[in-house]
UniProtKB/Swiss-Prot annotation:
Catalyzes the condensation of carbamoyl phosphate and aspartate to form carbamoyl aspartate and inorganic phosphate, the committed step in the de novo pyrimidine nucleotide biosynthesis pathway. This is Aspartate carbamoyltransferase catalytic subunit. Gene3D superfamilies: Aspartate/ornithine carbamoyltransferase. GO terms for biological process: 'de novo' pyrimidine nucleobase biosynthetic process; 'de novo' UMP biosynthetic process; amino acid metabolic process. It comes from Klebsiella pneumoniae (strain 342). InterPro entries: Asp/Orn_carbamoyltranf_P-bd (IPR006132), Asp/Orn_carbamoylTrfase (IPR006130), Asp/Orn_carbamoylTrfase_sf (IPR036901), Asp_carbamoyltransf (IPR002082), Asp_carbamoyltransf_Asp/Orn-bd (IPR006131). GO terms for molecular function: amino acid binding; aspartate carbamoyltransferase activity. L-aspartate binds at K85, R168, R230. Its EC number is 2.1.3.2. It catalyses: carbamoyl phosphate + L-aspartate = N-carbamoyl-L-aspartate + phosphate + H(+).
Length: 311
């Protein structure tokens, strides 16, 4: 059966309907249960990381290899013509698109991934993070993990903690969960790092409940998912970073009173916002969450590069 994601650019989580999300998650579950090492055997995929990455880059490239694709690209733009010779992003993408079947791209500038689609010659571009804007594939693995642990994506109480202003993962995840009914959001952040108004306006327009809080303890007993984020030092001036970095820290003792099946998620890397004693609790699920990135990204690559997919 033809699939709606074939040859589609995936730049924002809003490029995917609820039905698209459900298709990706169902495909991820099938690939987790039954690996397909030759599914992309004759495909070449570019992995273009203009910004530092560990989990996203390695997860994407592992996904490509495990599906049998050939992988080309770079993890540091400083040694490319763009970095050394001043080539434009448009020209870089125009050239790369003549070599490959798909482009996975991370870039520090908001909107760079969308710009790349204008110069890719129809070759699908998958956004692996563009500045503080969007991180759709992180959201796919987040949704996959939530569905696995909670058994649903509806009627959830979800708390998001930390840097909600620059944290692209929380922007994308909120927009995705807003496509499913009955979810409620609790936003816990310093005033300087509050959730952007456009996200709150979107929730209001959809009639989705949300509230602002000043402490994790305020909501611990109510939530199904506690989504922690780090304060992003690279996006703040030093004085602002010093003021907010330790404001919201989760310790094992804080989990007393949490629901039995509540899971703590984190897009990683963590710095100081989750102490290591949390790792030993049954609530900690961030390492399993990271592992699910393989299956979510495999699913997306498989769907974007196959007009028909029967697993």
């Amino acid at each position: 059966m033809a699939n709606p994601l074939y040859q589609k650019h995936i730049i924002s989580i809003n490029d995917l309907s609820r039905e698209d999300l459900e298709l990706v998650l169902a495909t991820a579950a099938k690939l987790k249960a039954n690996p397909q090492p030759e599914l992309l055997k004759h495909k070449v995929i570019a992995s273009c990381f203009f910004e530092a990455s560990t989990r996203t880059r390695l997860s994407f490239e592992t996904s490509m290899h495990r599906l049998g694709a050939s992988v080309v690209g770079f993890s540091d733009s400083a040694n490319t013509s763009l970095g050394k010779k001043g080539e434009t992003l448009a020209d870089t993408i125009s050239v790369i698109s003549t070599y490959v079947d798909a482009i996975v791209m991370r870039h520090p500038q908001e909107g760079a991934a969308r710009l790349a689609t204008e110069f890719s010659g129809g070759v699908p571009v998958l956004n692996a993070g563009d500045g503080a804007n969007q991180h759709p594939t992180q959201t796919l693995l987040d949704l996959f993990t939530i569905q696995e642990t909670q058994g649903r994506l509806e009627n959830l109480n979800v708390a998001m903690v930390g840097d909600l202003k620059y944290g692209r993962t929380v922007h994308s995840l909120t927009q995705a969960l807003a496509k499913f009914s009955g979810n409620r959001f609790y936003f816990i952040a310093p005033d300087a790092l509050a959730m952007p108004q456009y996200i709150l306006d979107m929730l209001d327009e959809k009639g989705i409940a949300w509230s602002l809080h000043s402490a994790i303890d305020d909501v611990m007993a109510e939530v199904d998912i506690l989504y922690m984020t780090r304060v992003q030092k690279e996006r703040l001036d030093p004085s602002e970073y010093a003021n907010v970095k330790a404001q919201f820290v989760l310790r094992a003792a804080d989990l007393e009173g949490a629901r039995a099946n509540m899971k703590v998620l984190h897009p990683l890397p963590r710095i100081d916002e989750i102490t290591t004693d949390v790792d030993k609790t049954p609530h900690a699920w961030y390492f399993q969450q990271a592992g699910n990135g393989i299956f979510a990204r495999q699913a997306l690559l498989a769907l974007v590069l196959n007009s028909e997919l029967a697993l």
